[in-house]
UniProtKB/Swiss-Prot annotation:
Protein's recorded name: WAP four-disulfide core domain protein 1
Annotated tissue distribution: Vascular smooth muscle and prostate. Periacinar ring.
Disulfides per UniProt: C58-C88, C70-C92, C75-C87, C81-C96
Organism (species): Rattus norvegicus
Known role: Has growth inhibitory activity.
Pfam families: WAP
Keyword set includes Disulfide bond: yes
Top-level taxon: Eukaryota
């Protein structure tokens, strides 16, 4: 093969190579806008995904179609609604409705502690059963006795000695119903095991009742 034929073959190969590269580049340039459009659409969906209607803040769907429900202004996400409204289903379409407040959360750190009544029974009591730092006395020595506030009774811890002028001393505990007296006595005996008996004063009275 002569040198002219070789040059012609090289020129033809180079021309085909240029045509192929330009075709590939043209195809990529033609596909680039489509790729960018798909990417931007995916980013938009990801960005608006968190603004979709929150079903947990929506009122339950009505059983009957409310008047004007189908004529209400429609929405697609909560961001299209005012502050206190959510994009919810109104029975016909999604529209901005009043948001439902979240359910209450029980904080068991501050909730009343359960009290065992025996068997399978439990009773929720107040946050504090003993009035903190509240001393009391039922001894009448010419002055008014140091009684407890309403709803509490004086649980005598130290009987005192009336002959020597020593008043009794106790703490204010919350009153119980008569049916709970046995449980209360057992609990107080565990908390204050001074001796085999306890003295509990009636509220507003000077005398004491002795529980064996």
């Amino acid at each position: 093969m002569g040198s002219c034929d070789r040059k012609a073959l090289w020129a033809l190969s180079f021309l085909l190579l240029l045509l192929g590269s330009s075709s590939v580049q043209g195809t990529w340039e033609a596909m680039l806008p489509v790729r960018l459009a798909e990417k931007s659409q995916a980013e938009e969906v990801a960005a608006t995904g968190s603004r979709q209607p929150h079903a947990d803040r929506c009122p339950p769907p009505p059983r009957t179609l409310p008047p004007g429900a189908c004529q209400a202004t429609r929405c697609q996400s909560d961001s299209e609604c005012p502050r206190h409204r959510r994009c919810c289903y109104n029975g016909c379409a999604y529209a901005c409705l009043e948001a439902v407040p979240p359910p209450p959360v029980l904080d068991w750190l501050v909730q009343p502690k359960p009290r065992w009544l025996g068997g399978n029974g439990w009773l929720l009591d107040g946050p504090e059963e003993v009035l903190q730092a509240e001393a009391c006395s039922t001894t009448e020595d010419g002055a008014e006795p140091l009684l407890c506030p309403s709803g509490y009774e004086c649980h005598i811890l130290q009987p005192g000695d009336a002959a020597q002028g020593i008043p009794n001393h106790g703490r204010c505990v919350k009153q119980r119903r008569q049916a709970e007296g046995r449980v209360l006595r057992q609990k107080l005996h565990k908390e204050y095991p001074e001796g085999d008996s306890k003295y509990v004063a009636e509220p507003g009275k000077g005398q004491q009742r002795h529980f064996p």
